[in-house]
Each structure stands twice: as C-alpha cells, then as structure tokens.
Amino acid sequence: MTELNPQPMLTRVESGNRTPLLPRQDPITQLPILILYPHSRCNCRCVMCDIWRSTKKEELGVDDVARWLPEWQNLGVKRVVLSGGEPLMHSDFWALCEAFRAAGIGITVLSTGILMRRDAVRLAQYCDDIVVSLDGPREVHNRIRDIPRAFEKLAEGVAAVRAVGREVTIFGRCTVQRQNFRVLRATVRAAHDLTLDRISFLAADVSTEAFNRPGGWDAERIAQVALTEEELPLLAVELEAMERECGEDFANEFIAESPDKLRRRILQYYEALNGRSDFSPIECNAPWVSTVIETDGTVRPCFFQPPLGNIFDAPSLSAILNSDEAVAWRRGLDTNRDEICRKCVCSLALRQTGGKYVQG
C-alpha cells in the first residue's frame, strides 16, 4: 500500500485543521496523482455523461503504459486513478494494474459497479480503493443509469468484493441533477445499505466538453440535467433536511462533504447557472499536482481544461507539463476568474499532512 490517503478526492479536512495547499511550483517535478482513461467505453447510458456514446473503442496499450512508468515514478506519482467510462472493460486491465503495483503506485478505480462481481477477487487483490457511482436509491439509480438492474449489480459487486476478505475501501459518488436532487437523504441510506465506506455528492458539469461532449451541450441537453430556478427551493429544503437528519453521518464523515460545502458546491452552483448567485470561490491546485491522460494520449491539466499536448507525440510527460506554453498557462491561471474553473464541479485541493496526501 502507498502512503496516499485512500481516494484523496473524498477526504475532508475541516478548516481549523488545514495544512497549506501543496505549492503551485513550476516546473512540475512532483506529481502525486495521475488520472488515466484506460479506454473509451462505458456500460451505462447516463443522461449527464456522453462517454457511452463513443464509437471509437480506443484503449491504451499495456506496453505504452509500461514504457511511461519509469518517468511517472521519477515524477513521484503515488496514486493512479483509473477513470472512465468503465475502466474494467479494458481488454487487459489487470496487466495494467500489475504494472502499477510493481512500480509501487497505488490504484483507485472509478467504476459503475456493473462488473465488480465478476472481478471481485482481482479488485481486492490490486486496488487500494474503489469509487462507485451511486445516483440514488434503487429505482432512481436504475432510471439514471438506463440499463437493467444497475443497482442490483452494484450491490452484488460490492458484496462480492467485501466477501473476498481483504480490506478495500469502497466509496460512493453521487452526481446531483434534476432526476435525483429530491432523494439525497435516501441516497445516503442506500449507501449504508450497500455497506459503502463513504458517500460524496457533487453537481453535474454542464458547461465543458469533458466526458465526450465535443463542442459542449446545447440548451436542450443542459435543461435535461441542470436544475431550473423553480427547483432551487426544493433542493434547499432537501439539503436542510439532510443536515438535520444525517447529523451523525456528517460528524463521522460518512458523508464526505460538510453541510456548508454541499450548499456552496451544489445549491450555489445551480443558483449561479440560473443567474441567482455567483459561483462559489474554489481552492484548487490540480494543474500543479495532477494530470489527466485520455485514451488517445491527450494530456490535460484536469478533467475540464483544454489539452496541453499528447503523450504519443511528445518525448515525455514532463516535456508536455513543463513546456513554455504549459508553464505560462499555469502562471496566468486564476481559478476564481477563469470561466472553466469558476464552474468546476470537481476541484482538487491537495494537501500533505502526517506523510499522507489529503483533499479539503
């Protein structure tokens, strides 16, 4: 196991106990987190994501990753986050994981949960933690995932990993949007029923090209996902009831975010989209402490910002991250003024405390 705190994106650090953010240093010589898209497919059909619509069927080769690994080790990568889509659909997924383990790099898998039962033994063998999508209680989750028995397959998968016996941290992540904002408390109960270790909530990104949305969404697609002005008071009521009824879950951090953060990052976000508020200021050092490598080799500073280059076309990842253009872009980046950053739903505020990396 690595010293990286399990799934740093979900670890809460209260303001009174915060250490400073990891510094925004240029050139980048230490990169604790690397987010990797192993392939371009998904086994769900969610309304808030278009990855499943891809017909490219691309995937990163194990030989390519093995060639890049020595440099990633030199950059101090502590954790690789295997994202998607559904990373478990990669044709040689476990060879990828074997390479990361051999390099001493911890593994986080972001999964729909559909294939977890099939792969339970190897998930327990290779992975430090698993983050599963949970969109609500059974009926809501199945409707949003738009495939038969999605919730049931998720439940079977979590149970199968638990049954292996090795302790693996399993988190849930819920994207709050029009189809589920009324059932946040029920989502917490569902997370308990599934024996998840924690549940996190975030708003839906409707503004960028991320998640296979070249050119972005038109107004009709945005309206399917983003809350309307008339729905905002109902969201406020649900968050208030959640704070009132889930006090213990907030206190012991079963719910990853504090009540105040949920109001800032979800309610205020949708208020801002409707012109009722400003977007909440964010604290983020993602472009300095992490990077995203997509299936076709595209390298981004985070999920949402434009590409910095392509790893297949460059001599190294460092050459991309530390090019004159990339350094100039980071030095000019003001996360509270940049249009993409202001609307970000998934910022990263990475700190180091007690020898571990934590988010918060």
In which residue ranges do the predicted regions lie?
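Radical SAM enzyme [4Fe-4S]-AdoMet core and its adjacent flexible, acidic
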Residues: 1-4, 8-10, 103, 126-129, ...
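Flexible mid-to-C-terminal extensions adjoining Fe-S/redox cofactors in radical SAM and related proteins
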Residues: 1-30, 52, 276-287, 292-360
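Conserved alpha-helical substructure of the radical SAM core
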Residues: 2-129, 223-235
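Amphipathic alpha-helical recognition patches that constitute DNA-binding helices
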Residues: 33, 37, 171, 205, ...
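Flexible, active-site-proximal loop/turn residues at the rims of small-molecule/cofactor binding pockets
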Residues: 55, 86, 136, 205, ...
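Short glycine-/acidic-enriched loop or helix-start segments at secondary-structure transitions
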Residues: 92-93, 119-120, 141-142, 211, ...
